[in-house]
Amino acid sequence: MQESINGNLSEERISGTQQSETRNGAPVNGSSEQQGTSGTEPNQLRFQSSVSDSERERQKAIDLEHRRAAFARHFGCAPGSEKHVENYSSFDEKDTRVQLAEFYRFNDGHFKKWGYF
């Protein structure tokens, strides 16, 4: 019984030493034996879009709707075209860049909240 346990332990030690020789399927010494058929390493990072195209379009439509509402609040009328809405910059709380003051009303709630002007 102990021999089989010792035998399993020795097999685990052997497999543990073999695993230390490779990292993520690529040899430690950097030889090109593990390269795929396309010539790139199999453990190379590949770009995967975290946001699908439909999700990106939905986000853009939501942003455009927010800009349209901000345009209507600022000028008191509906925009003439989508081009005017896209060109009108709306206030972004997360944007830390310096923003032009002439696009915003000075009594706007964002400025009171964050202490601008």
Curated annotation (Swiss-Prot):
Residues 1-52 have a biased composition (Polar residues). Keywords: Autocatalytic cleavage, Host cytoplasm, Hydrolase, Protease, Viral capsid assembly, Viral release from host cell. The record marks H74, F75, S90, F91, R105, F106 as: Cleavage. It is found in: Host cytoplasm. The proteolytic cleavage of the internal scaffolding protein B releases the scaffold protein in order to continue virion assembly. GO terms for cellular component: host cell cytoplasm. Pfam families: Phage_B. Residues 1-60 are annotated as: Disordered. The keyword Protease applies. GO terms for biological process: proteolysis; viral capsid assembly. InterPro entries: Phage_B, Phage_B_sf. The keyword Ligase does not apply. Its main location: host cell. One of its GO terms (molecular function) is peptidase activity. Its EC number is 3.4.-.-. Participates in the assembly of the viral procapsid in the cytoplasm. Forms first a 12S pre-assembly complex with protein H, and F and G pentamers, then twelve 12S complexes are joined by the D protein to form the procapsid. Internal scaffold protein B is released from the procapsid upon genome packaging. Autoproteolytic activity cleaves protein B and probably facilitates its removal through the pores of the procapsid. Component of the procapsid complex composed of 60 copies of the internally located B, 240 copies of the external scaffolding protein D, 60 copies of each of the viral structural proteins F and G proteins, and 12 copies of H. Belongs to the microviridae B protein family. This is Internal scaffolding protein B.
